[in-house]
Amino acid sequence: FYGQTVSWYPCGATGGMERTEAEESNSFSCAMVTVPLDYEDPDGQTIQIALKKRAADGESHGSLFINPGGPGSSGVQLVETASQGIFSQDLLAGYDVIGFDPRGVGSSTAIDCGQAGPAGGAGAGQPQPGQSFEDWAQGYSAGVTALEQQCAEHSEPGLLDHVGTLSSARDLDVLRAVMGEESLNYLGYSYGTGLGYTYAELFPDNTGRMVLDGALDPSLSAEEIDLGMAEGNEIALESYVEACQAGQTGADCPLSGEVENGVQQVRDLIASANTSPMGTSEPDQQVTGDQMSQVIRGALSTARWQELTAALTPAITQGDASVFALAANQMTQSAPAASMATMIAIMCQDRPSQGDMNSWENQYEEAQEVSPTFGAAWTNSDMTCAAWGHGNEPLPADITAEGASPILVVGTTGDPATRYEWAEALAEQLDSGHLLTWEGESHCAYGRGSSCISGAVDDFLLNGKLPKDDLVCSG
C-alpha cells in the first residue's frame, strides 16, 4: 500500500471528484488511493480513499493535509472552500493543500444507508411532555438500530466495523507516503484534532508540522464530551443574547430585559414549539422546538449571529417560524442519513457505550442542569452507541505523542462546541504540545478573521516557528 503509484487527473472546483478538462482544473487534481479495510488483515478486502489537491500558488513546501472535522465531514469539499477566504494567501502559496475524505465518508468508500430518512427514524431528540425518559429512550434506540441495519445492508461488507479514527490515522500515513512526504504536515479542525493527535500517537517519527484547532480532550468519555458541549452551548447562547440586546447582531433584537430574561425567552420559544409546532408562510409546514434548538445551536458563532436574530425576530414577535424552517431544511439536506450514520459509526468506534438506562437518565438530568436550554440535545451519545454497536476499536485515553515534533494546539475561549479547557488539556497532555489562544466566540479560530491567529499559524506551518509561549490573540 505504501508503494502504490497515484494517478492524478484534473477535477476543477466541482465540489467533488468529477473529471474536468485540464484548462478548467483551476489548480485542482484528484486521485484515489487503495488501503486495507482491516489493517490486521492487509491481504484481505480493500477500500478507496479520495484525495483532492490544490496546487501551491508559489514554490511549494510540500503537502499540507487538512480535515474539517465532523466526524464525517468532507476534506474533498474543504480543500475548495479553504481557497475562498479560509486559508491565507501565504499558506495557499506555500503548500499543495490536500483534502481527503476519511474512510466511510463522501467520495471515499462510504457508508450507504439507502433510502433511510435523515433522522434515521430515531424520533424526537428529547422526551416529549408527559413522556417518561425510558419510554423515549427505547423509541430513540429502536430508531438508531433500524438505521444501523439499513446502513449495514447497503454498505460494503465489514465497513461499519472499520471506520474508526485509529484506522483513518493509519490511512493518513499511507497517504503521506504515496505523496512522497517524509513527514505529515497537517491542519485539523474540531474532530480533525482527534485524527491528528491519534496520528501523532501512532506515528510520532512521521509527524511534521501539525496544527490542531478546536481541540478534543482525549481523556474525556463520551458522557463528559456531551456535558461539556451542552455547557458550552449554554454559555455561547448567553453571549449571543448579551450582544443582541446591545444591538450588535443586526436587526432589532426581539429579546427584552436582562440577559437571563432573553435566554428564558429562547427557552420558552423552544418549549412552546415542542408542545405546539409553530406555523410558517407555507400552510403545510410547521417547525418543532427540537428543530429550532438545532438551528440555534448551529448559529452560536459570531459570524452567524445576524442570521440567528433574523430567525428569532419573526418567531417571537409574530409567531412565524419561516426562517427557522428554511434553515432546518438546509441542515437536513446537508446531513442526510448516511452523513449522520457516518458520524455515529466513527463516534461509536472511538468511544463505545459504557452505560445503561439509569446512567443515561442521570446524564439527561445533569445536562438539563448545566444547559437548561439545550441539555436534552447532548444526552444520548452513549445511548446511541449502545443501540448502534460496532465498538470494536476504541481510542486510547492516554495520548502523549512522545517523540513527535512540536504540535500547535489552538483554542478559542468562547468556542460553543469544543471547549477552551479541552485545548488547554490537550496541549498539556502532548509531550510537544504548545497552546495558542484566541479570545473569540466561534467554533475554531484559523480562518475566522484574526490576523494574529493567521499569522501565528502560518508562521508555524510555513517556517516551523512556534508562537511565543501562551500567546493570546484578541479581536
Where are the model-predicted features located?
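N-terminal, charged low-complexity regulatory/assembly segments
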Residues: 243, 294, 306-307
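Flexible "cap/lid" loop of the alpha/beta hydrolase fold
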Residues: 216-234, 309-314, 320-333
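Long, low-complexity segments enriched in small/aliphatic residues
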Residues: 322-351, 355-360
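Structural motif
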Residues: 276-293, 301-304, 333-341
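Short loop/turn hinge sites at secondary-structure boundaries
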Residues: 135, 276, 303, 311-322, ...
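Short helix-capping/linker segments at secondary-structure and domain boundaries
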Residues: 298-318, 353-358
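Short alpha-helical scaffolding segments that buttress acidic/His motifs in well-ordered protein cores
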Residues: 291-297, 312, 345
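Gly/Pro-rich cap/lid or specificity-loop segments adjacent to the active site
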Residues: 1-291, 345-475
